[in-house]
Amino acid sequence: MLVLGIETTCDETAAAVIERQADGSGRILSNIVRSQIAEHAPFGGVVPEIAARAHVEMLDVLVDRAMREAGVDFAQLDGIAAAAGPGLIGGVIVGLTTAKAIALVHDTPLIAVNHLEAHALTPRLTVPLAFPYCLFLASGGHTQIVAVLGVGEYVRIGTTVDDALGEAFDKVAKMLDLPYPGGPQVERAAREGDPTRFDFPRPMLGRKDANFSLSGLKTAVRNEASRLMPLELQDIADLCASFQAAVLDSIADRIRSGLRLFREQFGTPRALVAAGGVAANVAIRNALQEIAADDEITMIVPPPQLCTDNGAMIAWAGAERLALGLTDTMEAAPRARWKLDATTETPTKFINTRARH
């Protein structure tokens, strides 16, 4: 099964072709990503209109390149998958409309993919992984602990009550005048800092639920930075290191609660899986490895290039759904908001409904 995947939900324009084998394994034939960092850097963050225009300018070129690198033509494709949300609506429209046009011209099934579901299923592209597993999804817009029970079967165990993890990293970077994109800059500065200099709060520690809260931690960083003004380079490094240390402690506690709740409801997970752009953070990856080792379960984190937004994850999610007979009509709508667990409710615009519930 050959599937073209298109990703345009934020500030990466991406296209990829994957092959799904009969045994359920996958192979990436091409995976082209074009970042928009240069376009958004002058503004210190993603500007939705600029992002949408960049997608329009680049997507056709990237699709053509992905097809050429994969060595296939459109007639060979079994499906066209596009991220239909959640995300910046202008970009989502660009990608989904392009996918619809290709699917219509070549009479190929369309799969409108939930971007979060694509992150959730990516580990199955990289390693043989059976359901169920516990997912820690951390990105610029989402921080969740999810029970992944099957394709289209998701139960949210914990979520952030305020800022997403990636959002908190970006906001801390901005208040410290670090370049865009902020998350990697905070991680880089933290390597040179003292994580014990500032005793920042560890929100939600010890609670029985698995929810996250990061706004108080972010405020504590802002207050300390304001007190120290003007900031020296070592101050910035120490603030970043202390912030990241607090985040790691919070993540560890929240995930341990999530694993306990997972076991109570669904039994022992096959693995603890991390996905989303924040999962590319080395310190966070190492902390997750320690949690999994303590809990005596397998830890799976996709390669960094598959943690951040990319077309291969969209193509793979499309292939997983296509294998169950799940396709969409041309009326599939772009969505700015689309909860992952809402994917368990098969939309009426699916052609058939063989997903397991």
From Swiss-Prot:
The keyword Metal-binding applies. One of its GO terms (molecular function) is iron ion binding. It is found in: Cytoplasm. Fe cation binds at H115, H119, D309. Its cofactor is Fe(2+). GO terms for cellular component: cytoplasm. The keyword Transferase applies. It comes from the Bacteria. Keywords: Acyltransferase, Cytoplasm, Iron, Metal-binding, Transferase, tRNA processing. Belongs to the KAE1 / TsaD family. Required for the formation of a threonylcarbamoyl group on adenosine at position 37 (t(6)A37) in tRNAs that read codons beginning with adenine. Is involved in the transfer of the threonylcarbamoyl moiety of threonylcarbamoyl-AMP (TC-AMP) to the N6 group of A37, together with TsaE and TsaB. TsaD likely plays a direct catalytic role in this reaction. This is tRNA N6-adenosine threonylcarbamoyltransferase. The gene is tsaD.
